[in-house]
Design a protein with these regions (language model features):
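Chalcogenol-based redox active-site neighborhoods
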Residues: 1-167
Length: 167
């Protein structure tokens, strides 16, 4: 069982955080228009999964804004912002913040067990049921080439390390 922390207190995750070198498990999520999005549709591109608890927290919102700015400069790369927020809340945030280079995806239906397969489901503590802050980078062939499980949920991910995996 992987662990992270929330405000200094240990938090358990359901299962093990995903490793590099394996084929990324496919998943289905919900887009803002309530249509489905499948990871398998991204083959041929680099994919950055920016995974976080909720857009209603400052650090999560900051990570989406930063990845949005970075995504504008990346070629052949998609950035997916993944949380359990409802698609309506994600859409409102993206509209208000001018987010145009990141695709917000909701795992609220969880038909493909993304949270368990990637080892990012928070299993206990005050954020139980939400997703742990993490970043996963997938290459155009569908292999995971970079992962970061942020050790403290209240901290931002290492943006530069994620981008370095793509270059």
């Amino acid at each position: 069982m992987s662990k992270t922390a929330f405000k200094g207190s240990p938090v358990n995750l359901a299962g093990e955080f995903i490793n590099t070198g394996i084929t990324a498990p496919d998943f289905t999520m919900v887009k803002g228009d309530l249509s489905q999005f499948k990871l398998s549709e991204t083959r041929g591109k680099f994919v950055v999964l920016n995974i976080f608890p909720s857009l209603d927290t400052g650090v999560c919102a900051t990570s989406v804004r930063k990845f949005n700015r970075l995504a504008a400069k990346m070629n052949n790369t998609m950035v997916l912002a993944i949380s359990k927020d409802l698609p309506f809340a994600q859409g409102r945030f993206c509209t208000t913040e001018g987010i145009e280079n990141v695709i917000p995806l909701s795992d609220f239906r969880n038909p493909s067990d993304f949270d368990v397969n990637y080892g990012v489901l928070i299993a206990d503590g005050p954020l139980s049921g939400l997703l742990a802050r993490s970043v996963v980078v997938i290459n155009p062939e569908g292999k995971i080439i970079y992962t970061e499980l942020v050790p403290e949920i209240t901290q931002e991910p290492d943006y530069e390390a994620a981008l370095a995996a793509i270059k």
